[in-house]
């Protein structure tokens, strides 16, 4: 069941890739993908290329995929291990969702962080109290880690 669904999503992604994202299996393992997300133009991540790993559980799509950033990113909802605090990857997951929708949600999280549900409280605090410093730091990290 899972591998059929994953294969279908791969075909759909190749046919109609989401804006500024790409994804596909690593080697021959259909349950382990790598995705690339381009930093959104209207965000401090602009110009960056962010690598993301996707691990599908055996009971996908009934359980959400595990998605994590491999590229370091300065963001209130993404921690230093690359874990992403995003409701659709946790309690709001639904089998109707696809990897394409997940990648688009991550892109919009880069543009619009959610400081009220932070994974990194210090960054959320900076985002709320000193937006200029947050944006400068995020831009700096993007240049350092996502433009190599």
Curated annotation (Swiss-Prot):
EC main group: transferase
Reaction(s) this enzyme catalyzes, per UniProt: S-ubiquitinyl-[E1 ubiquitin-activating enzyme]-L-cysteine + [E2 ubiquitin-conjugating enzyme]-L-cysteine = [E1 ubiquitin-activating enzyme]-L-cysteine + S-ubiquitinyl-[E2 ubiquitin-conjugating enzyme]-L-cysteine
Catalytic machinery residues: 85 (glycyl thioester intermediate)
Record-linked Pfam families: UQ_con
GO molecular function: ATP binding; ubiquitin conjugating enzyme activity; ubiquitin-protein transferase activity
InterPro entries registered for this protein in UniProt: UBQ-conjugat_E2_core (IPR000608), UBQ-conjugating_AS (IPR023313), UBQ-conjugating_enzyme/RWD (IPR016135)
SMART domains in the record: UBCc
Keyword Ribonucleoprotein: no
Listed pathway(s): Protein modification; protein ubiquitination
Cystine pairings recorded for this chain: none
Entries under Gene3D superfamilies matching the protein: Ubiquitin Conjugating Enzyme
Coiled-coil positions: none
Induction description: Not induced by heat shock or wounding.
Domain of life (superkingdom): Eukaryota
GO cellular component annotations of the record: cytoplasm; nucleus
Keywords: ATP-binding, Nucleotide-binding, Transferase, Ubl conjugation pathway
Documented EC number(s): 2.3.2.23
Cross-referenced CDD domains: UBCc_UBE2D
Domain UBC core: 1-147
Its job: Accepts the ubiquitin from the E1 complex and catalyzes its covalent attachment to other proteins. Mediates the selective degradation of short-lived and abnormal proteins.
PANTHER family referenced in this protein's UniProt entry, alphabetically: UBIQUITIN-CONJUGATING ENZYME E2
Subunit: Interacts with CIP8, CHIP, NLA and XERICO.
Family listed: Belongs to the ubiquitin-conjugating enzyme family.
Protein name: Ubiquitin-conjugating enzyme E2 8
Organism in which the protein naturally occurs: Arabidopsis thaliana (Mouse-ear cress)
Lineage summary: Eukaryota, Viridiplantae, Streptophyta, Embryophyta, Tracheophyta
Gene coding for it: UBC8
């Amino acid at each position: 069941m899972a591998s059929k669904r994953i294969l279908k999503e791969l075909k759909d992604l190749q046919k109609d890739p989401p804006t500024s994202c790409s994804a596909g299996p690593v080697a021959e393992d259909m349950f382990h993908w790598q995705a690339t997300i381009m930093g959104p133009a209207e965000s401090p991540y602009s110009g960056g290329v962010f690598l993301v790993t996707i691990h599908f559980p055996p009971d996908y799509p009934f359980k959400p995929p595990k998605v994590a950033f491999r590229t370091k990113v300065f963001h209130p909802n993404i921690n230093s291990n690359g874990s992403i605090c995003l409701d659709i990857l946790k309690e709001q997951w639904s089998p109707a969702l696809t990897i394409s929708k997940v990648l688009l949600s991550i892109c919009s999280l880069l543009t619009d962080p959610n400081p009220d549900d932070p994974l990194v409280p210090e960054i959320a605090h900076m985002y709320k109290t000193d937006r200029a410093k947050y944006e400068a730091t995020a831009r700096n990290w993007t240049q350092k880690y996502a433009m190599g």
